[in-house]
From Swiss-Prot:
Keywords: Ribonucleoprotein, Ribosomal protein, RNA-binding, rRNA-binding. GO terms for biological process: ribosomal large subunit assembly; translation. Binds directly to 23S ribosomal RNA and is necessary for the in vitro assembly process of the 50S ribosomal subunit. It is not involved in the protein synthesizing functions of that subunit. It comes from Synechococcus sp. (strain WH7803). GO terms for cellular component: ribonucleoprotein complex; ribosome. Belongs to the bacterial ribosomal protein bL20 family. One of its GO terms (molecular function) is structural constituent of ribosome. This is Large ribosomal subunit protein bL20. The gene is rplT. InterPro entries: Ribosomal_bL20, RIBOSOMAL_L20_CS, Ribosomal_protein_bL20_C. Signal peptide: none annotated.
Amino acid sequence: MARVKRGNVARKRRNKILRLARGFRGSNGTLFRTANQRVMKALCNAYRDRRRRKRDFRRLWIARINAAARLNGVSYSRLIGGLKQADVRINRKMLAQLAVADPSSFTTVVNATQG
């Protein structure tokens, strides 16, 4: 069986990693070994943060809704409970958007839950 040298494959693999590491600071973007470590770490962070982003945005929406609801004299939990009882099907993202962009409409929604 003939000996197979890895020239092409190894170079492509290294270049792929270095391409992913472009823009990293110092040797992290130029030396293969450190670049490989940084790329693996970056990919782990990206995977984790794609999931975390969903949680973070939900927390942001809830904080905005709570602040706007308290301006209307009702707490967040009572507002959400009232929306469920009144069968108002609007999600937290849209509620937060209303609270920021159109406070008068948000007040209308709050009043609908108290009736």
